[in-house]
Amino acid sequence: MTSRFGHSQHPRRGRSARARAGRREGVQSNFPATQVLERSAHSLPARQRTALVMAGGTGGHIFPGLALAEALRERGWQVHWLGTPGSMEERLVPPRGFAFEPIDFSGVRGKGLKTLLALPLRLARACLQARAVVRRLQPDVVIGLGGYVTFPGGIAARLARKPLLLHEQNSVPGMANKLLSRLATRVYTAFPNVLPDAQWVGNPMRRAFTRQPRPERRLAGREGPLRLLVVGGSLGAKALNDIVPQALAWIHEQDRPIVTHQSGESQIEALRRSYAAAGVEATLTPFIEDTAAAFAEADLVLCRAGASTVTEIAAVGAAAVFVPFPHAVDDHQTTNAQYLVKVGGGWLVQQADLTAHGLAEMLQNMKRQDLLAKAQKARTMRKINATRDIVAACERLAR
């Protein structure tokens, strides 16, 4: 029997029909429909988020980018890297398991009038190539860390309305980051007061730098010759390679520091000849696998003043003599070094003032207690949460 609306007037028979229908669909009849939908939604796998990292040209841009890329991957992100063919980033990034997206663009400073005149066409082509990468990947965030490749990638990101995060490693901003900072969603810096409306977070770096024991624990009870670490970087520092062996030769053998000297692959043979000619023994290496441990082991570091080097020395808490690269753009290495030197966290010696005799005298006059004080002051300037803060911002923007 049915009502005038055509529904069954026998409730038990009606519920049985619904139950049979539910079983046919694989759904228990005693669950409300909303609960079934919620349970189905929660069982779906979460969409994998994608980040496009842009950094190139030098290790100072690339290694902070790799620290961020690895942290994002640990959080389940898929990370792609925008770079240029035949570059340092193309050599370093793919072996670490990140997809490399090449576009054709390079620097213009010091390349002559012909290169400068061709810039508009080259930039337009690079922007189109970057735009194609962004369209294909549809990244949740785009992260620029400097180098010329960042500029066309940043333009492409904003045209596609993708969140653009910038990080400037140096105390003097590079051209690409300076131009893009007005368009970016978030801007971060490794040093204070670098770009307007930027958040000072420090430099992204591997956890090994932030987990070394404090200087007073590392240096407690040390005796004997000082342990000197000379760091020339990936390309080496010819001035250090030439002067340091001569300086050590001025010091009596019993008083000489125990030296580890890193020079870069291209200069290792010349460095061996320099030490042999000076009659000085040292551990010579083209590359240091664990830089954090090497900084922690040294009583004194003699090095250039790239942004990564300065901020990593601060993170570990190590005494350092900084010799800025004199041809760095806008002399930014001098400004980088002053961040620690101005608080008593190191020494600054311009390359033009660096002599073998002067360096020998400086090393002979150094005492461990003085080096410990420098290391402690350097450590007070460390900012170690950049990776955490930038990754957290990426996750907020990707929701």
From Swiss-Prot:
SUPFAM superfamilies: UDP-Glycosyltransferase/glycogen phosphorylase (SSF53756). Its EC number is 2.4.1.227. It is a peripheral membrane protein. GO terms for biological process: carbohydrate metabolic process; cell division; cell wall organization; lipid glycosylation; peptidoglycan biosynthetic process; regulation of cell shape. Residues 7-21 have a biased composition (Basic residues). It holds the Pfam family Glyco_tran_28_C. Pathway: Cell wall biogenesis; peptidoglycan biosynthesis. GO terms for cellular component: plasma membrane. Its main location: membrane. UDP-N-acetyl-alpha-D-glucosamine binds at T58, G59, G60, N170, R206, S234, I288, Q333. It comes from the Bacteria. It catalyses: di-trans,octa-cis-undecaprenyl diphospho-N-acetyl-alpha-D-muramoyl-L-alanyl-D-glutamyl-meso-2,6-diaminopimeloyl-D-alanyl-D-alanine + UDP-N-acetyl-alpha-D-glucosamine = di-trans,octa-cis-undecaprenyl diphospho-[N-acetyl-alpha-D-glucosaminyl-(1->4)]-N-acetyl-alpha-D-muramoyl-L-alanyl-D-glutamyl-meso-2,6-diaminopimeloyl-D-alanyl-D-alanine + UDP + H(+). It is found in: Cell inner membrane. Keywords: Cell cycle, Cell division, Cell inner membrane, Cell membrane, Cell shape, Cell wall biogenesis/degradation, Glycosyltransferase, Membrane, Peptidoglycan synthesis, Transferase. One of its GO terms (molecular function) is UDP-N-acetyl-D-glucosamine:N-acetylmuramoyl-L-alanyl-D-glutamyl-meso-2,6-diaminopimelyl-D-alanyl-D-alanine-diphosphoundecaprenol 4-beta-N-acetylglucosaminlytransferase activity. Residues 1-31 are annotated as: Disordered. Belongs to the glycosyltransferase 28 family. MurG subfamily. Cell wall formation. Catalyzes the transfer of a GlcNAc subunit on undecaprenyl-pyrophosphoryl-MurNAc-pentapeptide (lipid intermediate I) to form undecaprenyl-pyrophosphoryl-MurNAc-(pentapeptide)GlcNAc (lipid intermediate II). This is UDP-N-acetylglucosamine--N-acetylmuramyl-(pentapeptide) pyrophosphoryl-undecaprenol N-acetylglucosamine transferase. It comes from Acidovorax sp. (strain JS42).
